[in-house]
Amino acid sequence: MAMRKLLSKKLFNITNVASQSLMNCRISSSSLAVRTRVPNDSTDTTKIAPEPGDLAMSRRFMHNSAMIRPAEIMQMPVGESLIEKLREIDGSKDRIRLDGLSPPERETSLTVADTKKLLRAAQIEIVKSKLRETGRSWMPYKEFVSVCGEASSDPDLGSKIAKMLDDSANVIVLGDSVCIRPDQVTKSIEGLLPLPKIHNPNDPRRIEFKELEAEKAVIDVKAHTLVRKELWAGLGYLILQTAGFMRLTFWELSWDVMEPICFYVTSVYFMAGYAFFLRTSKEPSFEGFYQSRFEAKQRKLMNEYEFDLERYNELKKLFCSKPSDHVSKILGAIKS
């Protein structure tokens, strides 16, 4: 019995201590604990005794916070390290950069006026190509208008296209005739233009031209004489060759022996004429051979006499210019 009373007393004391500790615990959130721990009168400090270790925990917390804060402040990046830190963050990657976006391309469309210009230019080029295909220099105006009408979808536009070609100087309309190649007209008119200096008999260039012309005449005579000597020498060589073949054929040998010899000699002459044509681009005839040898002798003599051929040609073009064959056509068209 005594043992039971002792055990029950011990258990009762343990229960009281446990309930008291629960009531006094700071982490308890029950209403009973709040009512018990929080006094009604703030001046009464005798009801609740502070738990052992509360002051120590507070001091420890304040000490730790005081020790941590300076360390955290010292670890903050400053200066270049801050710039590197910002570069590592690189917040611009997630941003939308509008400055790099190009505006949408505008669609280029032809206006009605531009389309008309292109069609007109195409029609004019077609007309010019057709006129070149004819190979003619002059054409009646009616035929010219009909050609212009064939180039367009509407035949009535032929007169308008003809007028545009005339205004742009692609053709020259003279009365009822049309000159398809104005460049020939220009060259012909250049020969008809009066030049006052040319008609001056005391012009020093005219005197120079006469001297060069006289010197060239002497060179031409000498070249002609040399070429004539070569031609006579060639004729003598052919006569001797023919006489030699006749003697070999009828006196020394027979025709059976001379026939292949004459064939091969003729083949050699043919090959020589073919080579002459390849070199000079002239027909292998007596006249072609004469012209080729005359030009060769003339160049050789000009080099010996130091004759200025370029100056002579320039002065000859200036003082001895002759109108071309198209002048008569132009004058006839103008008169008509």
Swiss-Prot record:
Entry keyword Glycosyltransferase: no
Molecular functions per Gene Ontology: calcium channel activity; metal ion binding
Parts of the chain that traverse the membrane: 231-251, 257-277
InterPro entries the UniProt entry points to: MCU_C, MCU_fam
Compartments, record wording: Mitochondrion inner membrane
Protein origin, superkingdom: Eukaryota
Sequence motif Selectivity filter, location on chain: 255-263
Membrane topology: Multi-pass membrane protein
Catalytic reaction list: Ca(2+)(in) = Ca(2+)(out)
Intrachain disulfide bonds: none
GO cellular component: mitochondrial inner membrane
Keyword terms of this UniProt record: Calcium, Calcium channel, Calcium transport, Ion channel, Ion transport, Membrane, Metal-binding, Mitochondrion, Mitochondrion inner membrane, Transit peptide, Transmembrane, Transmembrane helix, Transport
Its biological purpose: Mitochondrial inner membrane calcium uniporter that mediates calcium uptake into mitochondria. Constitutes a pore-forming and calcium-conducting subunit. Mitochondrial calcium homeostasis plays key roles in cellular physiology and regulates cell bioenergetics, cytoplasmic calcium signals and activation of cell death pathways.
Similarity section: Belongs to the MCU (TC 1.A.77) family.
Name of the protein: Calcium uniporter protein 3, mitochondrial
Species, as recorded: Arabidopsis thaliana
Gene behind this protein: MCU3
